[in-house]
Amino acid sequence: MSALRSVAGLLQRWLLPARPAGLYDRQLVVLALALMAVGLVIVASASIPEGIAINNDPFMFVKRHGLFLVMALGISWFVLQVPMARWQHYNGPMLVLAILMLVLVLLVGRSVNGSIRWLPLGPFNLQPAEFGKLALFVYLAGYLVRRQSEVRERFIGFMKPMAVLFVVAILLLAQPDLGSVVVMFVTSLGMLFLAGARLGQFIGLILVGVSAVVTLVIAEPYRMRRVTSFLDPWADPFGSGYQLTQSLMAFGRGSWFGEGLGNSIQKMEYLPEAHTDFVFAILGEELGYAGVLGALFLIFALSFKALKLGHQALVAERLYEGYLAIGIGIWFSFQTFVNVGAASGMMPTKGLTLPLVSYGGSSLIIMMVAVSMLVRIDFELRQASAQARVREVS
């Protein structure tokens, strides 16, 4: 018990340190870079067979992933220079741009596996849904500041952002992309609840949302197959349950400490999407449950610090920054829950990436932009606190 208390104390001191005099929270940066490093290593291992099969180049995907990392870091550096007041001021145009991109992808987008989710930009493919997530949360944080009393006191104030979400959801479902819709819905509900929306409205919308998801699943045979295969994948291990059974076999082979980095069998064309949606299964096979717990701790710590930062911003009466930071924390944690749940058989597959780990340029860049926003929020809070102390002294 004393050892457990020591570990708990160590984690508490690391996750909840006294705010240092530095310019920003270095732990946020370290956590994000650590996740990106884990992703680079696992993508490099998981994508080798796919790269050979497509282009006879075992490092095809890891070279692209490395380029995405460089782009993500470069764009993040630019985002760090942008004051949060700018994001608050331009949240409306940002959402309009996201909606226009979602319309454009339906008109000229690239179809992959029956889904039209990508805009071809030369050698790159842009996924507007990823930008749409961030744009919606940036807009919703601004709305909650502008209409806080209306959200709390009037039903129409609660429903206006839900109407915006409905428009975005219709465009996403036309691709189709139910996974992104679910992430947006859950994150938006969390932000509205923390802004003081009435519990009855909140519960009613949850029931409507669950009913809508059930209807969408029943209406599409491929979604119904995903649900039935999730409930009993071994009933059709070479058909609808194939991907999940292969993923479960990867976790089983990994056991506690894994087969060793690069020694995965399931990535050898057995497990589809091994370097994207199911990269977590390959991580489990090669690094075992120890590696799984390590990766989950990094994501948990990043999400926890985002939520804690949001709380600090709300206490400091910086409402926009507080709502946005909390939204980012909910987004990261829920998307991780869905991705890990799909890979481990706890949830139907949704086609969502593991934050900062899975292969995918759009997801990686947008999530690093979100992390940069968190760092900027922390910087501005520290700056305001330092200025307040100077005024007190003078």
Swiss-Prot record:
Biological-process GO terms, alphabetical: cell wall organization; FtsZ-dependent cytokinesis; peptidoglycan biosynthetic process; regulation of cell shape
GO-annotated molecular function: lipid-linked peptidoglycan transporter activity; peptidoglycan glycosyltransferase activity
Membrane topology value: Multi-pass membrane protein
A cellular component term, taken from the record's GO annotations: cell division site
Record topology, Periplasmic segments: 49-64, 110-123, 176, 220-279, 344-354
InterPro entries registered for this protein in UniProt: Cell_cycle_FtsW-rel_CS, FtsW, FtsW/RodA
Biological or metabolic pathway of the protein: Cell wall biogenesis; peptidoglycan biosynthesis
Pfam families: FTSW_RODA_SPOVE
Family assignment from sequence similarity: Belongs to the SEDS family. FtsW subfamily.
PANTHER family cross-referenced by the UniProt entry: CELL CYCLE PROTEIN (PTHR30474), PEPTIDOGLYCAN GLYCOSYLTRANSFERASE FTSW-RELATED (PTHR30474:SF2)
UniProt name for this protein: Probable peptidoglycan glycosyltransferase FtsW
Gene that encodes it: ftsW
